Amino acid sequence: MEYHPDLENLDEDGYTQLHFDSRSNTRIAVVSEKGSCVASPPWRLIAVILGILCLVILVIAVVLGTMAIWRPNSGRNSLENGYFPSRNKENHSQPTQSPLEESVTPTKAVKTTGVLSSPCPPNWIIYEKSCYLFSPSLNSWDQSKRQCSQLGSNLIKIDSSKELGFIVKQVSSQPDNSFWIGLSRPQTEVPWLWEDGSTFSSNLFQIRTTATQENPSPNCVWIHVSVIYDQLCSVPSCSICEKKFSM
């Protein structure tokens, strides 16, 4: 069988022209394009990772910046609080009291030149309208009386049960000592008298006797802890001086 070329397919030189189907070429191109999408690198994942890293770095930078600002302020505050007195503490601080002073009811102090000051000498205790000195010196009753007089005071005169409670509370803290008070009598047969000459009333407290055959005339009075006794006036003992003042 002889091949007869189609004259329409001959070119100028007499060669036959070949025509391929364009649809197959298009299909190949599409497939290759789709294949390139599947085989493309994971750039989206890389972009997400880089974004997260940037966010973490930003958060760290903010935290470090906040700490850098806070530390100088806190250091300055600690210096002010640690080495300089607080004005609030100066305004609201109150003077401390000794245990002996805390056990009594405080009284109003006298104002002098705008400053509160005590109306009592040092080592004396204020109670109500009097100053009290619990002297540790061991003297006879007469010697204790003279000592109080030299200090511008007298051996204590107990006028009320409230004052008695105050005295008992003070001397109870010194259970090894007894204290002379301003109560005596010239002889056993006469009533007890205070230093100012007033008569003692047994309604206030009772005086326990220490009279014996060897010591029949204890004509002075002292207090030991919470009990009041008569005693020989010559026995050395501590004493309580009292000085009254006007408010």
UniProtKB/Swiss-Prot annotation:
**Disulfide bonds, paired cysteine numbers:** C120-C131, C148-C241, C220-C233
**Molecular function GO labels:** (1->3)-beta-D-glucan binding; metal ion binding; pattern recognition receptor activity
Indicate the segments forming the C-type lectin domain, all copies: 127-242
Q: Where is the composition biased (Polar residues)?
A: 93-105
| Main subcellular localisation | membrane
User: What does UniProt say on post-translational modification here?
Assistant: Phosphorylated on tyrosine residues in response to beta-glucan binding.
Glycosylated residues are N91
The record's section on InterPro entries has:
C-type_lectin-like, C-type_lectin-like/link_sf, CLEC7A, CTDL_fold, NKR-like_CTLD
Residue intervals annotated with topology Cytoplasmic? 1-44
Pfam hit, one = Lectin_C
Sites binding a divalent metal cation sit at K157, D159, E163, E242
List ligand-binding residues for (1,3-beta-D-glucosyl)n: R146, Q147, C148, S149, Q150, L151, G152, S153, E195
Which SMART domains does its entry note? Answer: CLECT
- Location(s) in or outside the cell: Cell membrane
Cellular component, GO annotation: cell surface; plasma membrane
Instruction: Give one GO biological process term.
Output: positive regulation of cytokine production involved in immune response
Query: Which parts pass through the membrane?
Result: 45-65
The ranges of region (Disordered) come to: 81-105
**Keywords on record:** Cell membrane, Disulfide bond, Glycoprotein, Immunity, Inflammatory response, Innate immunity, Lectin, Membrane, Metal-binding, Phosphoprotein, Signal-anchor, Transmembrane, Transmembrane helix
Please report, in chain numbering, the residue ranges of the motif ITAM-like. Answer: 15-18
**What does the entry state regarding organ or tissue expression?**
Detected in dendritic cells, in paracortical and medullary regions of lymph nodes, and in spleen red pulp and white pulp.
User: In this UniProt entry, which residues form the Extracellular topological domain(s)?
Assistant: 66-247
Assembly and partners are described as: Homodimer. Interacts with SYK; participates in leukocyte activation in presence of fungal pathogens. Interacts with CD37; this interaction controls CLEC7A-mediated IL-6 production.
Q: What does this protein do?
A: Lectin that functions as a pattern recognizing receptor (PRR) specific for beta-1,3-linked and beta-1,6-linked glucans, which constitute cell wall constituents from pathogenic bacteria and fungi.
Q: What is this protein called?
A: C-type lectin domain family 7 member A
